[in-house]
């Protein structure tokens, strides 16, 4: 079932999302990858204030290519999410509502999603140019020195993704593969 969500995402939106749902997001999301996550995590460990307010946000794991004329960003496909697994539970505990990436997550991340009633969405790897069309604008929020890995804010319209792990811990990476195994 395809669902349209206007961001910022609400607790009610998240509660109504089920693993396997197709979702089109419109509104504002933030971005960040490995290097930015490491810096945010280090600040959390020191008890310091983050340079960006993550409370209520969805973060997209992406490092976009340079924009072509007429586009806000270049191809903007998802980064493998496991690279942020060390950092995700701390961010969720601070109020992050969810993440957008690709691939499975470890048990600690799934537990943090359930504990915080969050969500993990996946964007389609290989569809970077299509995804870029849904990104209408961007601005750098912090860590500009990281180049493509700087934390940014994207305004998106009908950004396509799939619910991989819902707030109850239902996980397509566990439930779907057995359906396709040869018996």
How would you name each of these model-derived features?
Residues 88, 164-183:
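Active-site/ligand-binding-proximal alpha/beta "capping" segment
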């Amino acid at each position: 079932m395809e669902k349209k969500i206007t961001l910022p995402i609400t607790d009610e939106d998240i509660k109504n999302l089920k693993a396997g749902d197709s979702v089109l997001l419109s509104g504002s999301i933030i971005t960040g990858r490995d290097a930015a996550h490491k810096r945010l995590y280090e600040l959390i460990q020191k008890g310091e204030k983050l340079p960006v307010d993550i409370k209520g946000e969805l973060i997209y794991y992406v490092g976009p290519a340079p924009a072509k004329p007429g586009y806000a960003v270049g191809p903007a496909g998802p980064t493998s999410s496991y690279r942020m697994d060390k950092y995700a539970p701390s961010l969720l505990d601070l109020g992050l509502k969810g993440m957008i990436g690709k691939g499975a997550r470890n048990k600690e991340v799934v537990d943090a999603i359930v504990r915080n009633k969050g969500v993990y969405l996946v964007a389609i790897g290989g569809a970077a140019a299509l995804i870029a069309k849904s990104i209408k604008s961007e601005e750098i929020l912090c860590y500009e020195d990281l180049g493509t890995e700087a934390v940014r804010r994207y305004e998106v319209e009908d950004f396509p993704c799939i619910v991989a792990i819902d707030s109850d811990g239902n996980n397509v990476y566990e439930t779907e593969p057995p359906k396709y195994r040869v018996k």
